[in-house]
Regions:
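Short, low-complexity, polar/charged sequence segments that are solvent-exposed and flexible
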Residues: 22-25, 71-74, 93-96, 119-122
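Accessory nucleic acid-recognition modules appended to NTPase machines
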Residues: 1-69
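Conserved N-terminal glycine/acidic-rich loop preference
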Residues: 62, 68-72, 111-113, 118
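Active-site ExK catalytic segment of metal-dependent nucleases
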Residues: 70-82
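Catalytic cores of nucleic-acid endonucleases
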Residues: 79-121
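Hydrophobic/aromatic beta-strand patches that form the interior of the parallel beta-sheet core
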Residues: 4, 73-75, 101-103
Protein backbone atom coordinates (compact mmCIF):
# COMPACT_ATOMS: atom_id res chain seq x y z
CA UNK A 1 0.00 0.00 0.00
CA UNK A 2 0.94 3.63 -0.45
CA UNK A 3 0.27 6.14 2.31
CA UNK A 4 -0.99 9.58 1.37
CA UNK A 5 -1.28 12.49 3.79
CA UNK A 6 -4.18 14.89 3.40
CA UNK A 7 -2.02 17.87 4.31
CA UNK A 8 1.73 18.22 3.75
CA UNK A 9 2.15 20.09 7.04
CA UNK A 10 2.28 16.79 8.94
CA UNK A 11 4.88 15.39 6.56
CA UNK A 12 6.93 18.59 6.83
CA UNK A 13 6.91 18.73 10.61
CA UNK A 14 7.75 15.06 11.06
CA UNK A 15 10.66 15.25 8.59
CA UNK A 16 12.55 17.70 10.80
CA UNK A 17 14.05 19.31 7.68
CA UNK A 18 14.19 22.97 6.84
CA UNK A 19 12.86 24.03 3.44
CA UNK A 20 16.43 24.48 2.18
CA UNK A 21 17.40 20.98 3.35
CA UNK A 22 14.32 19.41 1.78
CA UNK A 23 14.81 21.14 -1.59
CA UNK A 24 18.44 20.05 -1.86
CA UNK A 25 17.63 16.40 -1.06
CA UNK A 26 16.18 15.20 -4.38
CA UNK A 27 14.65 12.03 -2.95
CA UNK A 28 12.98 13.83 -0.05
CA UNK A 29 11.87 16.71 -2.28
CA UNK A 30 10.28 14.18 -4.64
CA UNK A 31 8.31 12.76 -1.72
CA UNK A 32 7.10 16.22 -0.65
CA UNK A 33 6.22 17.13 -4.24
CA UNK A 34 4.28 13.91 -4.88
CA UNK A 35 2.53 14.23 -1.54
CA UNK A 36 1.43 17.81 -2.27
CA UNK A 37 -0.05 16.78 -5.61
CA UNK A 38 -1.65 13.75 -3.95
CA UNK A 39 -3.24 15.85 -1.22
CA UNK A 40 -4.85 18.03 -3.88
CA UNK A 41 -6.12 14.99 -5.79
CA UNK A 42 -7.60 13.47 -2.61
CA UNK A 43 -9.30 16.75 -1.74
CA UNK A 44 -10.78 17.05 -5.24
CA UNK A 45 -11.88 13.41 -5.12
CA UNK A 46 -13.79 14.01 -1.90
CA UNK A 47 -15.53 17.11 -3.24
CA UNK A 48 -16.29 15.78 -6.74
CA UNK A 49 -16.89 12.13 -5.88
CA UNK A 50 -14.31 10.18 -7.81
CA UNK A 51 -12.10 7.36 -6.59
CA UNK A 52 -8.31 7.48 -6.22
CA UNK A 53 -6.01 4.46 -6.37
CA UNK A 54 -2.33 3.62 -6.58
CA UNK A 55 -1.28 0.93 -9.09
CA UNK A 56 1.79 -1.26 -8.85
CA UNK A 57 2.74 -4.47 -10.61
CA UNK A 58 6.30 -5.68 -10.13
CA UNK A 59 8.56 -2.65 -10.56
CA UNK A 60 5.96 -0.73 -12.56
CA UNK A 61 3.76 1.81 -10.82
CA UNK A 62 1.44 4.74 -11.43
CA UNK A 63 1.25 7.30 -8.64
CA UNK A 64 -2.46 8.10 -8.92
CA UNK A 65 -5.28 6.39 -10.78
CA UNK A 66 -8.53 8.36 -10.81
CA UNK A 67 -11.82 6.62 -11.57
CA UNK A 68 -15.28 8.01 -12.17
CA UNK A 69 -18.15 6.26 -13.96
CA UNK A 70 -15.86 3.53 -15.32
CA UNK A 71 -13.50 6.13 -16.84
CA UNK A 72 -9.92 6.13 -15.59
CA UNK A 73 -7.13 8.67 -15.69
CA UNK A 74 -3.51 7.86 -14.80
CA UNK A 75 -1.31 10.51 -13.18
CA UNK A 76 2.43 10.27 -12.64
CA UNK A 77 4.21 12.92 -10.56
CA UNK A 78 7.82 13.75 -11.45
CA UNK A 79 9.90 16.32 -9.61
CA UNK A 80 13.05 15.51 -11.59
CA UNK A 81 12.05 16.48 -15.12
CA UNK A 82 11.21 12.99 -16.39
CA UNK A 83 8.14 12.54 -18.56
CA UNK A 84 8.03 8.84 -19.36
CA UNK A 85 7.94 5.87 -17.07
CA UNK A 86 7.67 2.18 -17.80
CA UNK A 87 4.83 2.02 -15.26
CA UNK A 88 2.71 4.51 -17.15
CA UNK A 89 3.40 2.77 -20.46
CA UNK A 90 2.47 -0.62 -19.04
CA UNK A 91 -0.63 0.74 -17.32
CA UNK A 92 -1.75 2.30 -20.62
CA UNK A 93 -1.35 -1.02 -22.45
CA UNK A 94 -3.25 -2.95 -19.78
CA UNK A 95 -6.10 -0.54 -18.98
CA UNK A 96 -6.32 1.98 -21.85
CA UNK A 97 -7.10 5.00 -19.63
CA UNK A 98 -8.98 8.02 -20.92
CA UNK A 99 -5.84 10.09 -20.25
CA UNK A 100 -2.29 9.71 -18.95
CA UNK A 101 -0.82 12.79 -17.34
CA UNK A 102 2.60 13.71 -16.03
CA UNK A 103 2.71 16.49 -13.45
CA UNK A 104 6.08 18.17 -13.15
CA UNK A 105 8.73 20.18 -14.88
CA UNK A 106 8.32 18.54 -18.31
CA UNK A 107 4.60 17.82 -18.05
CA UNK A 108 1.74 19.88 -16.65
CA UNK A 109 3.29 22.52 -14.43
CA UNK A 110 2.39 21.97 -10.75
CA UNK A 111 0.89 25.45 -10.37
CA UNK A 112 -1.45 24.80 -13.29
CA UNK A 113 -2.37 21.31 -12.08
CA UNK A 114 -3.16 22.61 -8.58
CA UNK A 115 -5.61 25.11 -10.06
CA UNK A 116 -7.35 22.63 -12.39
CA UNK A 117 -10.87 21.36 -11.98
CA UNK A 118 -10.03 17.65 -12.03
CA UNK A 119 -13.59 16.76 -13.07
CA UNK A 120 -12.64 18.01 -16.53
CA UNK A 121 -10.16 15.14 -16.86
CA UNK A 122 -13.11 12.76 -17.25
Amino acid sequence: PKYQVYNNALLSVLSGLSFKEAVTDSKRWGQFFESAIGAYIISEAFVHRFEVYYWREGNDEVDFVLKKNQKIVAIEVKSNGETKTTGMERFHKLFNPLATIVVGENGIQPELFLSMDLRKLF
